[in-house]
Protein backbone atom coordinates (compact mmCIF):
# COMPACT_ATOMS: atom_id res chain seq x y z
CA UNK A 1 0.00 0.00 0.00
CA UNK A 2 2.94 2.37 0.57
CA UNK A 3 3.91 2.10 -3.09
CA UNK A 4 0.35 2.91 -4.13
CA UNK A 5 0.20 5.98 -1.88
CA UNK A 6 3.63 7.18 -3.07
CA UNK A 7 2.91 6.72 -6.77
CA UNK A 8 -0.55 8.30 -6.51
CA UNK A 9 0.92 11.29 -4.65
CA UNK A 10 3.54 11.67 -7.40
CA UNK A 11 0.79 11.61 -10.04
CA UNK A 12 -1.23 14.23 -8.13
CA UNK A 13 1.78 16.55 -7.82
CA UNK A 14 2.84 16.08 -11.42
CA UNK A 15 6.26 16.72 -12.87
CA UNK A 16 6.41 20.46 -12.27
CA UNK A 17 4.40 23.67 -12.22
CA UNK A 18 4.51 25.86 -15.29
CA UNK A 19 2.84 29.08 -16.36
CA UNK A 20 1.02 28.21 -19.56
CA UNK A 21 -0.26 31.71 -20.39
CA UNK A 22 2.16 33.06 -22.98
CA UNK A 23 0.57 36.51 -22.97
CA UNK A 24 3.38 38.94 -22.13
CA UNK A 25 1.14 41.97 -21.54
CA UNK A 26 1.82 41.79 -17.82
CA UNK A 27 5.43 40.65 -17.79
CA UNK A 28 6.06 42.02 -14.30
CA UNK A 29 3.26 39.89 -12.79
CA UNK A 30 4.49 36.83 -14.69
CA UNK A 31 8.05 37.29 -13.38
CA UNK A 32 6.72 37.82 -9.87
CA UNK A 33 4.64 34.62 -10.09
CA UNK A 34 7.59 32.63 -11.47
CA UNK A 35 9.81 33.88 -8.63
CA UNK A 36 7.17 32.81 -6.09
CA UNK A 37 6.86 29.40 -7.74
CA UNK A 38 10.64 28.98 -7.63
CA UNK A 39 10.79 29.99 -3.97
CA UNK A 40 7.48 29.54 -2.11
CA UNK A 41 9.36 29.80 1.17
CA UNK A 42 12.97 30.07 2.29
CA UNK A 43 13.76 26.44 1.48
CA UNK A 44 11.37 25.07 -1.12
CA UNK A 45 9.81 25.71 -4.49
CA UNK A 46 6.03 25.70 -4.78
CA UNK A 47 6.24 22.31 -6.51
CA UNK A 48 8.18 20.83 -3.59
CA UNK A 49 5.45 22.08 -1.24
CA UNK A 50 2.83 20.62 -3.59
CA UNK A 51 4.52 17.19 -3.51
CA UNK A 52 4.24 17.13 0.30
CA UNK A 53 0.63 18.30 0.13
CA UNK A 54 -0.18 15.56 -2.41
CA UNK A 55 1.36 12.90 -0.16
CA UNK A 56 -0.61 14.04 2.90
CA UNK A 57 -3.77 14.30 0.82
CA UNK A 58 -3.47 10.74 -0.49
CA UNK A 59 -2.27 9.19 2.78
CA UNK A 60 -4.57 11.00 5.20
CA UNK A 61 -7.29 12.55 3.07
CA UNK A 62 -6.34 16.08 4.11
CA UNK A 63 -3.53 18.62 3.92
CA UNK A 64 -2.45 21.73 5.79
CA UNK A 65 -0.52 24.79 4.65
CA UNK A 66 0.92 27.64 6.68
CA UNK A 67 0.13 30.78 4.71
CA UNK A 68 2.36 33.73 5.60
CA UNK A 69 1.12 37.19 4.64
CA UNK A 70 3.45 40.00 3.60
CA UNK A 71 4.19 42.68 6.21
CA UNK A 72 1.58 45.01 4.71
CA UNK A 73 -0.88 42.05 4.48
CA UNK A 74 -1.67 42.71 0.81
CA UNK A 75 -0.33 39.44 -0.60
CA UNK A 76 0.89 35.99 0.33
CA UNK A 77 4.61 36.12 1.01
CA UNK A 78 5.34 32.44 1.76
CA UNK A 79 3.65 29.04 1.82
CA UNK A 80 4.87 26.20 4.02
CA UNK A 81 3.68 22.61 4.20
CA UNK A 82 2.42 21.59 7.65
CA UNK A 83 2.35 17.89 8.52
CA UNK A 84 -1.39 17.27 8.81
CA UNK A 85 -0.83 14.80 11.66
CA UNK A 86 0.40 17.73 13.79
CA UNK A 87 -2.80 19.74 13.30
CA UNK A 88 -5.96 19.68 15.42
CA UNK A 89 -9.09 21.73 14.79
CA UNK A 90 -10.28 24.33 17.26
CA UNK A 91 -13.89 24.11 18.40
CA UNK A 92 -16.18 25.17 15.52
CA UNK A 93 -18.21 28.35 15.90
CA UNK A 94 -22.03 28.48 15.86
CA UNK A 95 -22.01 28.29 12.04
CA UNK A 96 -19.83 25.17 12.05
CA UNK A 97 -16.75 27.01 10.78
CA UNK A 98 -13.39 26.23 12.35
CA UNK A 99 -11.85 29.54 13.46
CA UNK A 100 -8.34 28.13 13.75
CA UNK A 101 -6.10 25.18 14.46
CA UNK A 102 -3.76 23.95 17.15
CA UNK A 103 -0.36 22.62 16.16
CA UNK A 104 1.93 20.44 18.26
CA UNK A 105 5.09 18.59 17.34
CA UNK A 106 3.93 15.60 19.41
CA UNK A 107 0.31 15.23 20.49
CA UNK A 108 1.19 12.29 22.75
CA UNK A 109 3.31 14.59 24.92
CA UNK A 110 1.71 18.03 25.02
CA UNK A 111 3.44 18.98 28.25
CA UNK A 112 6.78 19.21 26.47
CA UNK A 113 5.30 20.08 23.06
CA UNK A 114 2.76 22.77 23.92
CA UNK A 115 0.14 23.19 21.20
CA UNK A 116 -0.07 26.68 19.75
CA UNK A 117 -3.05 28.29 18.06
CA UNK A 118 -2.99 29.55 14.47
CA UNK A 119 -6.07 31.20 12.90
CA UNK A 120 -7.71 29.62 9.85
CA UNK A 121 -6.86 31.01 6.42
CA UNK A 122 -9.15 33.93 5.66
CA UNK A 123 -8.55 36.46 2.89
CA UNK A 124 -10.96 38.89 4.57
CA UNK A 125 -9.22 38.86 7.97
CA UNK A 126 -5.47 39.27 7.62
CA UNK A 127 -4.72 40.45 11.17
CA UNK A 128 -2.56 37.40 11.87
CA UNK A 129 0.63 37.14 9.79
CA UNK A 130 0.34 33.32 9.73
CA UNK A 131 -2.81 31.38 8.90
CA UNK A 132 -3.49 27.68 8.39
CA UNK A 133 -5.30 26.39 5.32
CA UNK A 134 -6.67 22.95 6.17
CA UNK A 135 -8.67 21.05 3.55
CA UNK A 136 -9.51 17.54 2.46
CA UNK A 137 -11.92 15.19 0.75
CA UNK A 138 -15.56 15.86 1.52
CA UNK A 139 -17.26 13.14 3.50
CA UNK A 140 -20.77 13.33 4.98
CA UNK A 141 -20.90 13.80 8.76
CA UNK A 142 -17.22 14.76 8.87
CA UNK A 143 -17.35 18.42 9.87
CA UNK A 144 -13.81 19.12 11.04
CA UNK A 145 -11.61 16.21 10.01
CA UNK A 146 -11.29 14.21 6.84
CA UNK A 147 -10.60 10.58 6.06
CA UNK A 148 -8.59 9.11 3.21
CA UNK A 149 -10.38 7.55 0.26
CA UNK A 150 -8.64 4.21 0.79
CA UNK A 151 -9.87 3.69 4.39
CA UNK A 152 -12.83 1.58 3.29
CA UNK A 153 -10.49 -1.08 1.88
CA UNK A 154 -8.01 -1.11 4.80
CA UNK A 155 -9.42 -4.35 6.22
CA UNK A 156 -9.07 -6.08 2.85
CA UNK A 157 -5.45 -4.96 2.59
CA UNK A 158 -4.80 -6.29 6.10
CA UNK A 159 -6.43 -9.63 5.24
CA UNK A 160 -4.33 -9.93 2.06
CA UNK A 161 -1.20 -9.21 4.05
CA UNK A 162 -2.06 -11.80 6.71
CA UNK A 163 -2.87 -14.44 4.08
CA UNK A 164 0.49 -13.88 2.38
CA UNK A 165 2.26 -14.27 5.75
CA UNK A 166 0.30 -17.44 6.50
CA UNK A 167 1.34 -19.06 3.23
CA UNK A 168 5.04 -18.38 3.80
PLM regions and their residue ranges:
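Structured, contiguous alpha/beta core segments that scaffold functional sites
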Residues: 1-168
